[in-house]
Amino acid sequence: YNYPLWTSNITITILYCKIKRGYTTLIFLCFSVKDRIPLINDFFHFLSNFGLDVWYDRRNIYLGDNRREKNITYGAENPNVNYAVVFYSENFKNGNICLEEYKILLERYYKNEIFLFPVFISEVPPKLDKKFQICKTLVYKHINDQSDFNALALHIIAKITFDDLNNSKFKSIHDIVLDYSDKTSIYYKLIIEYQNIKKTNYNMRIASLFFLYLIASQTRSISFFYDKTMNYIYHQNCLDILVDEKRELQIMENIICYTFSVL
């Protein structure tokens, strides 16, 4: 594919990229079955835009399966689950399996085995039972319908990509600049161009990071999650669909830092 650069008449040919389908991050959705349709079901499908690996009972459990074994052993207790979204509602507090899952997730949270994302459906209750207090102690979000999915997903992905930087040589774009010895490299020049873009020119900054990612990843093994996320954010930007919190840029910079750490 040929992509014209925005700074000159140069055209860069993208050869190929190696995409790793597997990804170590697994997210568990904890919710009341009464909230499944349509809200949770639709949110699960929305997350597929980003290539996240999500444990969701409607996808992972089949007719005839042992429900408890699947939900608990392969779900909440699964050592591969390192993030969990807890959807609290009036239905949730009176639930059955979801409360058993929640208890396990909470125990794992206090052991630093997982990270919790508390989400309130509809309204945030003024008072909560003691066992649910952590949902208000932690930074939380609340959602009403599909219009809230994008902001929630971006918060989740921002945290995951930030955590990935623990295994990255670079923690910021500026770190890459300081480390780069070859000042004639196309990578170095594109990063400098990115830094020179006016901070308020948000659309151009996203486009710049996307093309930098395309070039940097063309001969390197990258995660399906990263590739889907970068593409989704870029194409949403092309449609001028952005949220006010501007999490997109933070996510893209995190992915660039991780990608360059394995160059």
Predicted feature residues:
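Cross-kingdom TIR/SEFIR domain
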Residues: 1, 44-165
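Charged, amphipathic alpha-helical linkers/stalks
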Residues: 161-184
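Conserved N-terminal substructure of TIR/SEFIR domains
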Residues: 1-83, 113-114, 188-263
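Short, highly charged low-complexity linear segments
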Residues: 146-152, 179-187
